[in-house]
Amino acid sequence: MSAYTVSRLALDAGVSVHIVRDYLLRGLLRPVACTPGGYGLFDDAALQRLCFVRA
């Protein structure tokens, strides 16, 4: 399983970090885990979901 941060998820999906954070607030994306520092981590399914929503 790949673990993506918000910035890496945005980069791989070709969208801005602001779009990813907006989708988080709207409930379209959810992190699968959090780092000890509180950063959300996303999996490959989240990347696919983000690409699907953007299409």
Curated annotation (Swiss-Prot):
Residues 3-55 form the HTH merR-type domain. Keywords: DNA-binding, Mercuric resistance, Plasmid, Transcription, Transcription regulation. SMART domains: HTH_MERR (SM00422). Residues 6-25 bind DNA. Transmembrane segments: none annotated. PROSITE patterns: HTH_MERR_2. Pfam families: MerR_1. Signal peptide: none annotated. The keyword DNA-binding applies. GO terms for molecular function: DNA binding. This is HTH-type transcriptional regulator MerD. GO terms for biological process: negative regulation of DNA-templated transcription; response to mercury ion.
